[in-house]
Amino acid sequence: MALGLEDKKAIVAEVNEAAKGALSAVVADSRGVTVGDMTGLRKAAREAGVYVKVVRNTLVKRAVAGTDFECLADTFTGPTLIAFSNEHPGAAARLLKDFAKEQEKFEIKAAAFEGELIPADNIDRLAKLPTYEEALAQFMMTLKEASAGKLVRTLAALRDQKEAA
């Protein structure tokens, strides 16, 4: 079904708005994925704070022009599904990577983060970024280990000092 000019402008504006507020983007090819599976992906995306849309290549190229995701323009070939992470940079990459494991026909093309193009084979770089809570927990564990190590060294020094006296 052909889209009218106003419909095309609305789609470009919607995707552009999503791109402006996004932290990262992932582009994929969803050929061969059933409607039911795509519905499940969209539901999971909403829960994860990820904007997912299947858009015509010419429209998505116009929508990302002038944003950090302009570097993805060469990946817009064939059927294009684009996902923008709004809350956490790795959310879209993690979501689509997990979906690709379940769906053998689903193929991730590339991702972008802070204006840098990330090829599909390096998508783990983005998907493995810790969330704020995970990073905070890792930091606290490091502090806890450091203070415990300091206590052990202090007690050992105290013991050595008493043995020497």
Swiss-Prot record:
GO terms for biological process: translation. CDD domains: Ribosomal_L10. Keywords: Ribonucleoprotein, Ribosomal protein, RNA-binding, rRNA-binding. One of its GO terms (molecular function) is structural constituent of ribosome. The keyword Isomerase does not apply. Pfam families: Ribosomal_L10 (PF00466). Gene3D superfamilies: 3.30.70.1730, 6.10.250.2350. SUPFAM superfamilies: Ribosomal protein L10-like. GO terms for cellular component: large ribosomal subunit. Part of the ribosomal stalk of the 50S ribosomal subunit. The N-terminus interacts with L11 and the large rRNA to form the base of the stalk. The C-terminus forms an elongated spine to which L12 dimers bind in a sequential fashion forming a multimeric L10(L12)X complex. Belongs to the universal ribosomal protein uL10 family. Forms part of the ribosomal stalk, playing a central role in the interaction of the ribosome with GTP-bound translation factors. NCBIfam families: PRK00099.1-1 (NF000955). This is Large ribosomal subunit protein uL10. It comes from Shewanella piezotolerans (strain WP3 / JCM 13877). The gene is rplJ.
